[in-house]
Amino acid sequence: LSMLGDIRYAPVASVVMGFHRQDVEHPLDGFGALHPEVEQLHSLGTIFSSSLFPGRAPLGQVLLTSYVGGLRAPHLVTKTQDEICKHVLEDLKTVLGVTGKPTFRHVCVYQRAIPQYDVGYGRFKTFMKELEGRSDGLFFAGHCRDGVSLGDSIVSGHDAAGRIAHYLKATS
């Protein structure tokens, strides 16, 4: 199993901030925004959480979730939460026209957030499949096995649940 520790991951900080609606110029009428490297922003992108999921913010407020780090700027996740929030707030002012201070903020840092499917990554997938094949009751699922997106992880979990159910039926 120690081989799986060699999978390279990008670190990411998730920064959730709430604002009074009148302090955000952008209509927030979509999913969010990805911030391409050419824009020279600190954050990778921002999701308009309260637009996507009603009830995520009190009436008259909005909730925004930004992501910092990745392979583009892994050093940013080593900063203090105050420094990370300062960088994100600068970006939100630029991209969304935020004028006020956050009414709420929460930062989570994930040192091993996104597995990198580098050249040769297939050896990890092969190892997982072989290990599952020779280890009764061992099943792998998730972003390190079947894709990094949330959708990929859901499908991976569903498929693993099916394999587990089949295994349990066959062994009982």
Describe each PLM feature range.
Residues 94-104, 166-172:
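Surface-exposed helix-capping loop/turn segments at secondary-structure junctions
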Residues 63-65, 129-148, 152, 156:
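Short FAD-binding loop at a beta-strand-to-alpha-helix junction that anchors the flavin cofactor
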